[in-house]
């Protein structure tokens, strides 16, 4: 028996004690993230949002086996948000349509949901009326039975049979009424329920998964009362697709007890918020760097290369890497680098090394004096820089794996590592270093 075949099937139940613990963690991390974002100017916030939405659109499509050009998505979002100085890659009409759906949903999060809106969004996903070379119904609820299957033709495995077409109008009316109704459980739980509820109805022939994730984002935006989105769950689901589909299948064969789904969903939310912290740290450090370096004369090539590394490109800064990325000769790369060293923009990691590597100078003074108990830890295979800042503040910053490896091998000095990952903590006035952020 499938869940929708039960009476009152949407009276979902869960273990409140287990779920509330994770809900508190999510809410705390949301608060920390938005506290950090409050230190950014509006332009920097838009850039952070654009990067997040780029990942959301790309990975939400990738979950369904659809590959989008990331640069096209980024360009489309930047243009629609009015962000300048972004490398432009002309997006396809399809990419523009998909991006338009996401932006409409989050920018109008406080507007009521409707059948017409959902149908228009689904149409945008399939402008030609085809999905994987098969003609599908678009702009309307499906008119045929829907079986979720896998395997080769003739030996398919049925994972789920959705409600029959004659039930879709009433099922969706009930869903939309709940979606626009009073929030009695908190936006995090509501977003998880909306996701599960919508994909279980499966109202369209295709596009249901992407719409479910968009609706989840909408409810999170409502809960935060903000159209600015800085984290997304799609990238985390994409990393764990097998568990995603396995849990959905178990819950859809269950009796409405959805604790397992809520726990999994909120753990992915926590991962998404941690990833967003990394993006924000990168933007904070980059902003701090350019405040200091704004008056330093540089060529366009030097500026582009610095921005590439400031945005987290994972590679050592060497003349060979510089020449390859900048598409210039090695001699030109050496001149570029030496010029920036002379201007205190780059510093040699190990002075006199046979094959020198360089780090970007965020703060000209050694900030190691402000940090104690510095170490590198691992969590789920991801390296983190942990330290105590000014004797009372615990810092935990996600690192590039290459930097963690180089530090442990003695190739990256502690001062340069702290400079790269913790500069946002320090601002400078005309006389002394001071705290850039007191509280997040």
Per-segment meaning from a language model:
Residues 122, 336, 403, 419-423:
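Polar/charged side chains located within well-ordered beta-strands of beta-rich proteins
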